[in-house]
């Protein structure tokens, strides 16, 4: 949206713009897909772009990891959580859902009535952790239906892993800070090693998400 472009083109974000053409040299189009949803880049291209633009690649001295993780031999089992074998998300068109596989301990994602496949690997998307982050939302542009999602005010959510789910809260001190997630007793959540899927959920639709023991 034009609102996102305003933010991307500000000094707040190190931006490699492949939308308006400024950084077009670092992107390519996959002609097997329909434009405009066929623009891609690579890690090598982004590294080259950062060098070209002179972006700082060093972490600040006070940097801390975005997430906290357990070790492989000390899994967070969420013993007090509700059973979460299926997680159905309320999106009118895609109607996505996750199904828990007890054999490998991963959640496999589906949408549009079928498996969601990673185009680069040919494999179904699967993650170890799911975070549902409930956010306030409003219409920024009623004509085009552009949503304004509030990522700063904090709120509720769910943490899902190993076939269980627990309620959480989330906070973000400022736009320059990272989002932190907490258990109901105020402890920062400990994720299990593996991929983590953060699902942004509008507060108005959060009650329509379903976590079940199916």
Q: Predicted regions: what is each one?
A:
Residues 1-214:
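A surface/extracellular/periplasmic glyco- and lipid-processing/surface-interacting theme
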